[in-house]
């Protein structure tokens, strides 16, 4: 998460932990608080804002730039009937915009959309896929 600034304290939070910023709630098994605006989350990480749910093993949150970077073997982003699977997901809790790189798969009903990179706009429920985009649907 980076160096600890002089004067900052580091607090280890063991046991179910929750934090809130910009209307997003982040829960996990344990956390390390580096400052008022920098927290690292471990184990069963869940970020929830409105209808968006982001699941991972670990997350780093920087409140100064309103960004949560979520890591896992498979990060899962669920918004109603659509689910995105990727390896790393960056979510801005103020703008409600996420992005992924390194590959992602969106599953929605009978469709499957794959791309190397993408941007997710939670307010409008839109996914913009970039770089080697492929869609699969039995009807097309």
Label each residue range with its predicted role.
Residues 1-140:
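N-terminal amphipathic/hydrophobic interface segments
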């Amino acid at each position: 998460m980076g160096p600890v600034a002089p004067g900052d304290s580091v607090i280890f939070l063991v046991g179910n932990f929750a934090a809130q910023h910009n209307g997003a709630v982040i829960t996990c098994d344990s956390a390390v608080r580096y400052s008022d605006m920098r927290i690292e989350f471990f184990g069963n990480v869940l970020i929830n804002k409105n209808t968006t749910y982001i699941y991972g093993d670990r997350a780093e949150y920087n409140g100064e730039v309103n960004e949560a970077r979520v890591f896992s073997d498979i990060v899962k982003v669920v918004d109603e009937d659509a689910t995105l699977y990727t390896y790393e997901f960056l979510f801005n809790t103020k703008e409600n915009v996420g992005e992924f790189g390194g590959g992602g798969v969106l599953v929605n009903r009978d469709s499957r959309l794959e791309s190397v990179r993408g941007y997710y706009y939670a307010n409008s429920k839109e996914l913009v896929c970039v770089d080697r985009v492929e869609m699969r649907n039995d009807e097309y």
